Every structure is written in C-alpha cells, then in structure tokens.
Amino acid sequence: MKIQHMSDLHLELTDNSRYIKYNEFPVTGDVLVLAGDIFYLRNDVAPLERFWKWASANYRQVLIVPGNHDYYGRYDVMTKGMQWSWKFKENVGYYQNQVVRIDNVDFILSTLWSHIPPMDEYAVSHGLNDFYQTLYNGHRLTVDDYNRMHQFCLDFIKWSVAESTAEKIVVVTHHLPTRQVVAPHHQDSLINSAFATELGDFIVNSRIDAWIYGHSHTNIDATIGKTKIVSNQLGYVFHNEHLSNGFDAGKYIEI
C-alpha cells in the first residue's frame, strides 16, 4: 500500500488556500493521510470544496487527524470529546483516537497532545496560542488539561498497538513522538515540550512500521528501531515555509 501524507495545510489562511487551489497535487498514494492543522473545526464545514472533491475522487480513503490549530477560534475540545470521527465525504474524514483498518494495515490516529512538565509550565502556557485560542469543558485550556489529553492519547496509542492484529501498523499524530525530529535551531526552545514528547523507548520496542507527524513546520525524517518517522508539512505559505522546509506534495511511504 502506498500512503501519501502531508500536514499543516492551514486552509483557514488565505495564502495557503490560494496555493492549494492553484497547485493541484500529484496523486502518488492509495490512501491520503493528513496529520493535522487542516482547517478550523468550529465552522462545521470543510473549506475549499474543490480540494476535497479531488481528494475523495483520487484516494480510497482520506484520513485526517485533528491538530492543535483545528481547535482554534475558542472551539471547545470537549464538544466532540476525546474519541470521535467525522466524515464529511463518504471516504474523507477526521479521526480522533480511532483505529481504521484498510486491507492489512491498522492506522492508529490521534492528536497526541504533548506532555508539559512542571518546569516548562509558565513558558508554554504564556508562549503558546493554544492556551488563548482553545477551550476545554467551557474554560480556557490549561496545562493540566493539556497533560490530561496527552495521557489519554498516549494510552490509546499504546493499547491500540498492543491489540492490533493487522500485519502492518501506521501511527498518525499531529504532535511529534520524539525529540529526534525537533529542528536543531529549536532544540533549546523553552516551549519544546508543547511540540514533542520523547517516546523513543516505546517506539523501538514496538512493531509500528511508520509514524507520521506534523505540527513543527520543519520536515525531518528519522528511523527508530524499525519504525520510520516521517513528516511532510506545508506550513505557512506567507512565510515561504513550503519552500524552506522542502514540502513535497507527492511524498509517500510504501507499507
């Protein structure tokens, strides 16, 4: 199976929508995976209908994981809860803490909110827009909420990997599963814990074939044990991140 993957399309931004509208992507996969930050869920409608018609027509399934930005605009994370799916076309939809079996492959899909340790709490809660743009059960998102969601997502991923009877396993998250894929110029950032959680020990001892991530707006691939860690983020077109980070609309992995 060929799995074409990308993330951080940010269709809520005019420049990004325009870029995608006028640059039709090649079809290189059987399945398309979108690893978060695609559009605002609060609108309850997918923007750029032409793009979704194209995606629906060209892939067996289009699997989307919600990113942190998908909840922006003071959307309440718990409106949908911690486990949900939403298909807005027959074969296109969002999946939060869900497993989708396609042929002999289990796709384990989760935002995987990161873990923020106490020493980082002040810097992250004051330096990350998530805590100003997102609600949780009617109140502004807190670090405790973030960590609670992280633990739920991580427990779900670990349980799903352990229970899988599929021949192949692909994990899809928005947040980074290891600091090995944090860009060198961000390694000393005070808010790194809002982006990556070190799961290397779990990954190396697992039978995960590939892990697709987004969020960081830097595309760094790695291998941990036998697991390929891959990303393909468009990022902010108005900052030319699609150029500086080497976004490849046709990037795929074969499982």
Spans of features found by a protein language model:
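Hydrophobic alpha-helical segments and helix pairs
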Residues: 77-132
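Active-site neighborhood of phospho(di)ester-bond hydrolases with catalytic His/Asp-centered motifs
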Residues: 5-7, 32-37, 63-68, 93-97, ...
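Active-site-proximal loop/helix segment associated with metal-binding centers of metalloenzymes
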Residues: 108-170, 175-186
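Beta-strand-turn-beta hairpins that frame and shape the catalytic cleft
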Residues: 1-4, 99-109, 168, 223-228
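N-terminal active-site segment of His-dependent metallophosphoesterases
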Residues: 1-64, 71-79, 136-140
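A short helix->loop->beta-strand "cap" motif at the edges of active sites that frequently abuts
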Residues: 57-61, 166-167, 208-209, 226-227
